[in-house]
Every structure is written in C-alpha cells, then in structure tokens.
C-alpha cells in the first residue's frame, strides 16, 4: 500500500525552456528542497571542511593556493555548481511533475529522459561536486580535497544507485531499466551530449507514446531523506574519527 493518497495529474512540460526552469524556484515544493541544501547539506559540508583543516594541521600540511586566489576560484565554482543544480532541479520539477526531494512532495511522477537527463541520470551531482570542491578550495584543505571529496562522491553514487534509483524502478518499471542501460549515471558519453544538443529523448519516444504519470508513490519513499541524514552523520563521524587518529 502506498504512503500517500492518489496524486493529481500534473501539467507536465517534457522540454521546459531554460528560463522556466530557473523560474520554477518559486514553487514551494522546489524552494523547500533548496532550503534543505542551505540549512542542512551546506552546514554539514562546512563541518567537514573544518575537520579537513584540523587533519591538515595534524599532518603539517599547508593550505593550497594563496587566499587571494582560492577564495574567488572557490566562489566561482560554488556559483557555477549552484546554477547548474538550480537548472536541473527546475527541469526535473517541470518535466517530471515533482521535486527532487521526496521528503517534500514524494518526487517526480513522470520519468524524465530529455534535456540534461538525456545525457546522464543524475546531472545535479556534477553541480554539487563542483560546489563541494569549490568549498574545499576556499578552506584550502588538502585533506578535504584529497580524501573527503572522493568519499563523498562514492557515498553519492551508492545512495543514488541503491536508494534513489530503487524507488525509480518501483515507480517507472521497465522503462527506467532501459533508461539506466542507455544513460550513464555521472560521466556523459559523446552520444548523450549529442542527444542533449539535438534536444532528443534518451528513449526516443514520441510525446503521444508516453505513459501517464504514476498515480501514487512507492511505499517507503517518504523515509528516503532520513537515510541521507543518517549517512551525513556517519560521514562526519568518520572524518572526526580520522582527525582523532592523526591528532
């Protein structure tokens, strides 16, 4: 049985324009999702960066780059990554009929295989990765950039594949399996980039052939965010443990 009552059929736009994707931030479901990033994810990343500087100090590692270089460089990376996440989240919201944050509205009700999602399955991860690296550069922490960032990337890949995509398979069935086989998770292929530039869908389905939006969300979808919170706490604990070991 589903965790929620049947969903109203959303008005979907399969290929939303760029401006509409950015304007979608005015939707409560979308800006609440961004609030989680600002008030939960960003502070957690700041704590990890601080732990990285403590490990640097314990190991005698100097800060990377002069402050006059790393601050504008890092801010530029954070801004670029943030704009990319803003765009792809807006695209998913308009084309998929739901927020990327399942804790807000249960998530998309239609599978999206156009725009940036015809190129890779999780385009927002690239923007987040760019922002996290930029944050580490601002802090100047070698430990954060060399050790923490790869761990965060692995964590993201694992949770996307075995948590987020599990719900996508339950929600969209065999179509998502075909989509996953055709579209890589994070590293775009030339064919995917070409599809994006030509504004082609990954599954090459005509609009008239698309199935209707799903009528309900998979059981357990509302608890997905709790897994991410537990993961963040465990990661911070791991990095704090490394600091304790080397201090």
PLM-predicted stretches and their roles:
Residues 112-123:
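Short, amphipathic, aromatic/basic-enriched membrane-interface segments that mark the entry/exit
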Residues 122-125, 175:
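An acidic site on a long C-lobe helix of protein kinase domains
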Residues 1-114, 130-247:
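Membrane-anchoring alpha-helices and their flanking helix-loop junctions
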